[in-house]
Amino acid sequence: MKKIKWFSIILLLAVAMCGLAGCGENSNVAEQPIQEGMDYDVIVVGGDPEGVCAAVSSARSGLKTLLIEDDEALGGLMTLGKLNFIDICESRDGSILTQGLFMEFYDAVGGTAFDVETAKQFFYDCVVNEKNATLKLNTEFIKPVMDGDTIVGVVVEENGEQATYTASRIIDATVDADVAAAAGAPYTVAGEDIGEKERHMGVTLVFELSGVNWDKVVDYLENDDNEGTGATDKTAWGYTREGYAYEPKDDLMRLRGFNVARQDNGNVLVNALIIFGVDAMSEESKAQGIARAQKELEYIVPYVRENFIGFENVELAGTASQLYIRESRHIIGEYQLTIDDVLENRDQWDKIAIVAYPADIQPTAGQTYGTVIGSPDRYAIPFRSIVPLEVENMLVIGRSASYTSLAAGSARVIPVGMAEGEAAGVASAYSLNNAISFRDMSADEAAIADVQKTLKKQGAYLDDFEVHEAFMEHWAYPGVKVIRSLGLLDGGYSNDYRLDEPMGKWRLQNMINNSLKKTGSDFALVEDITDPVTNGNMIAVAARLADVEADSYTGQLSGLQEKGIVTEEILNHMGTEHEAPMAAEAIMIVANLYNYYLAQ
């Protein structure tokens, strides 16, 4: 493990608490000289909310901090992407779990929905009011500066020229983990970890409308006898039927229900337009996606006038300059958060945030709807998940941190990354003050306890917890975990896997084919499941796939038992040959068949 030699260090007497209203300067921090030969203690690359939190946290911890952003303003997706309807991390009892710096933002901008210009100013003030922070806008990351496997700085382009800045610690807050990837950290792309590298999850272009009659919107959505719609003085959600009824001119577009948030000027921002076929790693593809969406809006706006109550007189006032992209790289760190961590509400010994959000997988081309794998009450983000493998002196925060692709469906939301950013700043101070690497910290209980103690003082919610889910007691849950981990089983918002319902033909056939495809094995696609499904037909198909040479039902069962595909527990729950299998039995058999193929 490489360690940079210290020449002059003054230990911090206290780490500053985050309690300032409006992000004013925190004067209660000790001055600390940087390491000899370094320009800064910490460089944060990426000015989205996650990066702002990291930079502010680092600066308040007494570290000389540089924040680099390649655009003209801070806030990223929330400001330039105009996504002003926050995905709040709430537990089932309604408690907001992300506190600390996130709550400073939440309180300052007025809650769940906010004015974009207000947010933009807030983020700017947060950084420039910190005496230990330096902000560089319109500054593009070009490449990392490396000393072996240790990152010691970044090369950037500013004012048309390249410049190099060095630091003892680097925090990658870019949305695609560009710095970590360039430095050599391992990663997967999209759903690569479950055999879906080429999937391009739908992206969104937020658009702005003027001329909305808000009183009519509220009256309609509050009285349409639909529990899933509603409106407040600032937000509205609904028009699902109207949205999905729109027939796009571009086949790679979908309009869905509206999530709407008002601006201070009376206009509204709408999150509803899904764009397919956009490669999140290609600037050209993203630019084309924006252009295609803007063209489609020429047809959408007249449709909205004719079909959306309260929108009869709207005009298009503009669009975001950035796409809302939900997935690109997934860095591999000391620990990868899994979908089981999320949906089993797991605590972590090294937690730096407690969060909650449904595991929401957006549709891809050809799909009308996305998938909700499940919905947790709460779970913990471990420090290990922001420590990338193979690169020293770096942390990675935000949606491209170390989560599996399914777990990222939940952990990708902005408040999670903001909490990680605050923790990254505190961890950087601990790392420098104690001459310990991030990697060593990730295995050091005392170090993590110190970081957690500081975060709690600053307002973070990090209490230990234990939340148990009833579905985990089901006898077939081991099979659920296998199939769910492949992205082939969803429980929706209520975590209902329909285990005790009869298994349908298409559900079973698709589950078999798609799970076995993910093993990389050659097999004949299953196309002969009967409708309705019987135990006899299901067992015959499984026997054929497992090369069991038997014609009778009992012979096939015996052969599958020998291969571990049918177990005594499954037999104890199965009915007769001619009865329909419940989903529980079918899922267990498919899971065992998948594991059998993997072992070949």
Question: What are the functions of these language-model segments?
Answer:
Residues G24, Q162-A163, A167-R169, A177-A449, ...:
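Flavin (FAD/FMN)-binding glycine-rich loop and adjacent Rossmann-like elements that form
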